[in-house]
Structures are given as structure tokens and as C-alpha cells.
Design a protein with these regions (language model features):
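Catalytic centers of hydrolytic enzymes
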Residues: 5-9, 13-280
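Active-site-adjacent helix-turn-beta-strand microarchitecture at beta-sheet edges
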Residues: 1
């Protein structure tokens, strides 16, 4: 129960953080008014949770003070980039398939929900993935469409490095709004005037925007964050149909490799048996 409670706390905390990214970018002085489709937060960059009670700016800073930006000041800046719909689905798959043994890849999103089955084949665990607007309405993801994504510098680099770590199996390439690959993510930091918009500042400003419901002069975390809103749902079904339906390209490739390996082994066994029989 303690582990479940802690996991739920983390989900709610990271939902607040990912929503803060969206709020900050859409409300910063340098915003061009373009809607943010998805915000991505990795659990690995968050150093502390937010417990019930007063949350100070110092606590927010301490929870997200890792790294620096181009300006050399403490804290990773927010990054504005674009991913294709296909890459967004891959982001969900990275979390579902890799995060259990590579915790920095555990991701939380605002604007994108997904369902995954931990018993399915690796890189084919996600069974449903879709966007959700501010009204909560479901929007299907179009594979070739560019979507506006906001994350922090650390996450942007981590997602970009997935290609190397997966030996080319997985590809997530942050792009500009015209679809050109971004070479230096630091050049795409979200600016607030002449300053980089730091992730911790975005979180603090978002919390300060909450309504003061008890009229004590301090903003209150909304009731909305008392639940996870099924942003990430685990379907633990072991039904054989649910385990094999809708195979993606990774599943097909893995099955193909297994068939080839088994075929080679059978040929070797057949060859060895043939040689032994000849010697007799």
C-alpha cells in the first residue's frame, strides 16, 4: 500500500509539473499564441515530491534545480520543439517498455494519454495512445502530423539520445516548426523576455496561479489533482488475444528476428545430425 501511495503521489506531482509546462509556455510574455499539444516530464529529473501542506518556492526550486541552460544559471530551461505523431507514440512506448530498467525514461505527459499492458512484448506494450485537449475530449494522433511539444532541456536531450541507445530501433528527433531536425536544443529554449524560462520557475508560477479557495492569501492546489485522470493506464490482462493483437513494427521485427534465429539453429542441428550419420 505504501508503494502504491507513493506511486500515486508521484503521478499527481508529475501531472502538476507537466501541466505547469503547458501553462508557462502559453502564458509567457514571448508566447506566439501557439497551442502546446503535449508536455513531457521525466521522473528522473524531479528530486523531491510535494507533500500535503504548504509548498514554498524554495521547495519547488529544490525539486527541480538540476542542470543549467545556455545562460549558465541553475535549472534546466523549457524547450519548445515538434515531434511527429508517430514519434509521440514512440515516447509512450519508451515509457511503457524501458522505464522499469532505465528509470530516467519514466515519463509523465500533459495532453497525451495512453494505455499499456506490461505483459506484452517489449516495444509493443502500448495498446492505445491519444491526445486530450483542455476539454478532455479524445483526439486521435496522426502519424505524419507535427505536434508542438514542450519539455525541459534534460528530457529533450534524453529523448534525442534514444536513437543511439536503441541501436537505431527507436527514433525520436526533436524538430523546429518546419519539420527540420534541431541540432542544438539550447537554441530552442523558451524565453521570457531576455531570460530563459526555467522549469522550476514555470512550476512555481503555475502553482501561484491556482485559486485561493480558503481565502488565507495562499493559492490552493485544485481538487482536479486528487486523481490521476487516467493519463497513464496499466492493463494487466493476460488474455492471449490482448497480448498479441495490433502488433507494431517493433513486434513484427522482433518476431522476424526470432524466426530467423530459430531457423538458423534448426539448420545447424540438421547439418550436425547429417554429418554424424555420414560418419557412421
Amino acid at each position: 500500500h505504501t508503494a502504491y501511495r507513493r506511486q500515486r503521489q508521484m503521478c499527481i506531482r508529475d501531472s502538476i509539473i507537466s501541466d505547469a509546462y503547458v501553462y508557462a509556455v502559453e502564458n509567457t510574455g514571448d508566447s506566439d499564441g501557439e497551442k502546446v499539444d503535449v508536455a513531457i516530464v521525466p521522473a528522473g529529473t524531479v528530486r523531491d515530491t510535494y507533500t500535503k501542506g504548504d509548498i514554498t518556492v524554495e521547495q519547488v526550486y529544490n525539486s527541480f534545480s538540476l542542470g543549467t541552460g545556455k545562460d549558465g544559471l541553475a535549472g534546466y530551461p523549457l524547450i519548445s520543439a515538434y515531434l511527429t505523431g508517430k514519434e509521440l507514440k514512440t515516447v509512450a512506448e519508451v515509457d511503457a517498455s524501458i522505464s522499469d530498467f532505465m528509470t530516467i525514461a519514466r515519463l509523465y505527459c500533459s495532453g497525451m494519454n495512453f494505455i499499456y499492458n506490461p505483459h506484452r512484448m517489449i516495444l509493443n506494450k502500448v495498446t492505445d495512445c491519444y491526445l486530450t485537449g483542455k476539454d478532455g475530449e479524445r483526439e486521435e494522433i496522426q502519424d505524419d502530423k507535427l505536434y508542438h511539444v514542450v519539455t525541459d532541456l534534460y528530457t529533450g536531450r534524453m529523448l534525442g539520445s534514444v536513437l543511439d541507445k536503441s541501436y537505431g530501433l527507436i527514433s525520436i528527433v526533436p524538430k523546429d516548426k518546419n519539420g527540420n531536425p534541431i541540432e542544438n536544443l539550447e537554441d530552442y529554449a523558451v524565453m521570457d523576455g531576455k531570460k530563459e524560462l526555467k522549469a522550476w520557475v514555470a512550476i512555481a508560477e503555475y502553482m501561484q496561479s491556482f485559486e485561493d479557495t480558503d481565502k488565507d492569501g495562499i493559492a490552493n492546489v485544485p481538487e482536479y489533482y486528487n486523481t490521476t485522470h487516467e493519463r497513464k493506464v496499466i492493463d494487466s490482462s493476460k488474455n492471449i488475444i490482448n497480448l498479441v493483437k495490433h502488433p507494431n513494427k517493433f513486434a513484427v521485427a522482433i518476431v522476424g528476428i526470432c524466426i530467423v534465429v530459430v531457423g538458423v539453429i534448426l539448420l545447424l542441428i540438421f547439418g550436425i545430425v547429417k554429418i554424424i550419420r555420414r560418419r557412421r
